[in-house]
C-alpha cells in the first residue's frame, strides 16, 4: 500500500488589516501676537482650550476661549497672582 504525504497550501495570501494610519489635524493653538507688539481691535491674541491664560485689561474672551483685543494698542503678557497668567492691551499715548 502506498502512503502519500501531501500538504496543501493556501491559494490566496492572507491579507492583514491595520487600525492605524490616521491622525487628527492640528488645531494651531497658542500665542498669535507677541509681548510688546502693536495690535488693532478685534485681533486674536491667543488661541487656547480652557483658560490657560486669562483676559486682562481691554481683552475679551470668545466662546472657544480665544483671547482677542478690544482696542488698538500694545500687547502685554503679565502674571496674575502666583500661578496664573493674563494678557492685556494698553492704549498707546500719542
UniProtKB/Swiss-Prot annotation:
Q: Which Pfam families match?
A: Ribosomal_L27
GO annotation terms (biological process): translation
A GO MF label = structural constituent of ribosome
Q: How is it modified after translation?
A: The N-terminus is cleaved by ribosomal processing cysteine protease Prp.
Q: Which UniProt keywords apply?
A: Ribonucleoprotein, Ribosomal protein
Question: Cross-referenced InterPro entries, in alphabetical order?
Answer: Ribosomal_bL27 (IPR001684), Ribosomal_bL27_CS (IPR018261)
Any one GO CC term of this protein is: cytosolic large ribosomal subunit
Cross-referenced Gene3D superfamilies, in alphabetical order?
2.40.50.100
Coiled-coil ranges per the record?
none
From the UniProt record, list the residues forming the propeptide: 1-9
PANTHER family from the entry? LARGE RIBOSOMAL SUBUNIT PROTEIN BL27M (PTHR15893:SF0), RIBOSOMAL PROTEIN L27 (PTHR15893)
The Swiss-Prot or TrEMBL record describes its family as follows: Belongs to the bacterial ribosomal protein bL27 family.
Q: Which HAMAP family match?
A: Ribosomal_bL27
Q: Kindly provide the name given to this protein in its UniProt entry.
A: Large ribosomal subunit protein bL27
Q: Which organism is it from?
A: Staphylococcus epidermidis (strain ATCC 35984 / DSM 28319 / BCRC 17069 / CCUG 31568 / BM 3577 / RP62A)
